Amino acid sequence: MATFSKLSERKRSTFIKYSREIRQSVQYDREAQIVKFNYHLKRPHELKDVLDKTFAPIVFEVSSTKKVESMVELAAKMDKVEGKGGHNAVAEEITKIVRADDIWTLLSGVEVTIQKRAFKRSLRAELKYVLITSFFNCSRHSDLKNADPTKFELVKNRYLNRVLRVLVCETKTRKPRYIYFFPVNKKTDPLIALHDLFSEAEPVPKSRASHQKTDQEWQMLRDSLLTNYDRFIATHAKQAVFGIKHGPKSHLGRHLMSSYLSHTNHGQWVSPFGNWSAGKDTVESNVARAKYVHIQADIPDELFAFLSQYYIQTPSGDFELIDSSEQPTTFINNLSTQEDISKSYGTWTQVVGQDVLEYVHSYAMGKLGIRK
């Protein structure tokens, strides 16, 4: 019996779309024993050959719905990609941003745009959360969305005392990873983004396909936010990198972080932190490689020291405070009360652990300077 070539994974939505094409086009001639249908495939004759051998004497006629482009059309498309869009343009623009040390300017600029243009407070908090957390975790939007808010925990850190992390079980390759939150000596701060999300939005009941079995009851973000975010950035953000046709919007953070770490001679941290699969320990390209997998790996304390902007790496490789008067634990001197936390975070208090909410709220009140 004939066998198919190695199977490849497809998104559920893609599978449903292709199945619909078959159902809507299938025809069967009983007398001639011929089955006809359309399918989204570049080389339908390969599928036909396998089906003919497998189900003989039935003969299959498979027509492709995939558009066949002429050489003229392909040449025109390549000219367009070379001139304005594509991975090369994205790589060049991100390299420019990283080398000019404009990452913080870009992030704060987009944050200001969100503050001015997103009029609904919950949407404003969600958009900022995606912008900031995707960068500081070199993360996909889907990982941010699928994080389980009941799985937050505080872990010890040699330089920052403690960092916060939340577990993501449902990832692209079904291998768990963590999303991290830690003090950053900039206005763009993942802990403040998390505080704003807790304050303005609500936990979302876990969405699942009918075939999925999971005990997870909640997720951090709503499913439709990816579309909202990409549309908002495309409409309102004026930075050059967002003007590239088919360029990254919600995925920009992971490209920026991978390039930032590589440019600052910390490329060995890209794969374990961002879960990139590059075939090497170090990602050399400024835009991380196309293959992307999740791996559970211990993230070194030094990475968070570097990203916090409180520390600088010495020639010997150690990390020391940039300014001894500025400590990453400065803003958690006074703990928030249960009443303050409940008033600020509402429904999240029923989902997230008390110690986690206390840490986030205390930090935010201290850094934002609004503690009584």
Curated annotation (Swiss-Prot):
The active site is at Y292. SUPFAM superfamilies: DNA breaking-rejoining enzymes. Keywords: DNA integration, DNA recombination, Plasmid. GO terms for molecular function: DNA binding. Residues 85-367 form the Tyr recombinase Flp-type domain. Gene3D superfamilies: Intergrase catalytic core (1.10.443.10). GO terms for biological process: DNA integration; DNA recombination. The keyword Zinc does not apply. Catalyzes the recombination between the large inverted repetitions of the plasmid. Belongs to the 'phage' integrase family. This is Recombinase Flp protein. It comes from Lachancea fermentati (Zygosaccharomyces fermentati).
